[in-house]
């Protein structure tokens, strides 16, 4: 399972550390003997903790190497540690998955790397880490700073306006991982940029190249503006940008197209629409050859392109555009407006509702979710699973056994439901980040489900339902009493949990398969 998780001395000549460097590689290999001294001699280091067999590590390797080469010129070293050879070192650094990327400012000061795992993102992120939260601007470095990153925010603030500067500096501190910030109190520089003091200007390498803030100097207002101004009118969805779009707080419109030429044409066609609805929805193209499978997640035919769909992450809602229609910008704009106005019902992917329930575990589909999980006065434990998930398959017999504890007793079944839903074949209201995910929806508090993270034994799951459900049903006690009543006095049979449920092993604990 993956987990995610200046002032530098030159790498050449200045370091007394002997670090094993791979041939013709700018990524430096460290071990137990070299790690501490290297970190203490370098003011800023990005470290990758990896395993040679790890697929994600192999995918990252060439990008990490390219970033190391580019950052070497800026005296920002990138290092790596093989955790299969350095188990103690990796354990001491809290490594729980591969690859783990950490930023070090000395051996005792580290934090997780939070950027994308792409060359450009690694370089941009680490450059921002090497600079102060707010860099100083003068006539000589203005143009260099304006183009130092894809997004640069500069405050033109007079020296006597400390209130505005302090608000700007505070915001910069909170967002230094995401944007590059600078400031100047020179009125002449502000004038040369066509702005009056105080002003905040966002420079970018796309669209209109710069935007000037005209709102209140307040953290939330500034942040909302920066997020909006830094988003292209029509961008491109990929590994580097996806999380930003999903976390933007507004719906996202996807334009699936197979060729670069098509995507460029749609970009131009949709720019006026994006400008009209800026701040209400983001619009972006996506390479259908590389990421066409994602169309299926939006309830589109993933074999038919071009295609268009809107996703509202806040509502977990999807609005696919009719693929039988031509993808005409003017017609699609009407669809966008109708979605924003609430005139379009979201598309819900669902398996057929079972005609009858077979077995102790209740099968839930999207169209029965509300009735079986939400609109009732029962404590409902729901497993979100995927058919291909190994951990889900391992859980299945124990989950059946758990469900039988309740289903075999009408008085318990009236208060507790043990259920499952195939989250790959049915749309579910809340995001699922791994399989299996187990959530308890207590009676009277369905809007506050409780996610289970303990060992997946029958006993522990039953106790979880008892302790967190409204009805506090103790199914284990009922089962134990029945066993004792039906067994021989001198040689009582062990309970179901004693006979069939071994102590949890490491593999039985709350592992998840990646989505």
Curated annotation (Swiss-Prot):
InterPro entries in UniProt: PDI_thioredoxin-like_dom, Prot_disulphide_isomerase, Thioredoxin-like_sf, Thioredoxin_CS, Thioredoxin_domain
UniProtKB keywords: Disulfide bond, Endoplasmic reticulum, Isomerase, Redox-active center, Repeat, Signal
Pfam families tied to this protein: Thioredoxin, Thioredoxin_6
EC top class, as a word: isomerase
A cellular component annotation (GO) from this entry: endoplasmic reticulum lumen
Disulfide bonds: 54-57, 389-392
UniProt EC number: 5.3.4.1
Sequence ranges assigned to domain Thioredoxin in this UniProt record: 21-132, 339-470
Reactions it catalyzes: Catalyzes the rearrangement of -S-S- bonds in proteins
Family to which this protein belongs: Belongs to the protein disulfide isomerase family.
Protein name, as recorded: Protein disulfide-isomerase
Lineage: Eukaryota, Fungi, Dikarya, Ascomycota, Pezizomycotina
Gene: pdiA
